[in-house]
Amino acid sequence: NETGVIQPIKDVVEIAKKYGCLVHCDAAQALGKVKIDFAEIEFDFLTLSGHKIGAPTGIGALVYNDKINLAPQILGGGQEKGMRAGTENILGIRGFGEAAKFIINSTEKNCSKVKSLRDYFQEKIKTLSPETIFFGEKANKVANTILMALPKIPGDLALMKLDLESFSVSSGSACSSGKVS
């Protein structure tokens, strides 16, 4: 999620399975950006986050192989096929479902448009700062993520300049945003 580079997950899963390992894939960043084929890649567990595709915050999904004997995390009640007690968030579930339908049906079109915007952004940055380093530039990557370094330009100055040029950017990772380091 920092570089946008798409990892060779199918190869990783094949190696893990060869050694009898269970495989969990955090696909929060992938939904709506790359095709996820449960039949093609033999994940044991796959997790998704609704807020990454416009669904309400706090809703997600755990997709798991039904051959796995998964133990409930919270006992009581029959909710979520007996896997978790408590009232289900019906509005969140519905919102996630609707967002997933929308994003899955528009992934290819959206990715093509976003890729062209990404390429435009990179070209514009190169004209402003030819020394810019784009990490994973030649790799297979999602359309919406760029990791770059602007040598000799302080981060706060770069943020202000890019903001004035109508680009939405951040300095550092989302999980460290707003923290003093």
Predicted regions and their residues:
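Pyridoxal 5′-phosphate
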Residues: 1-181
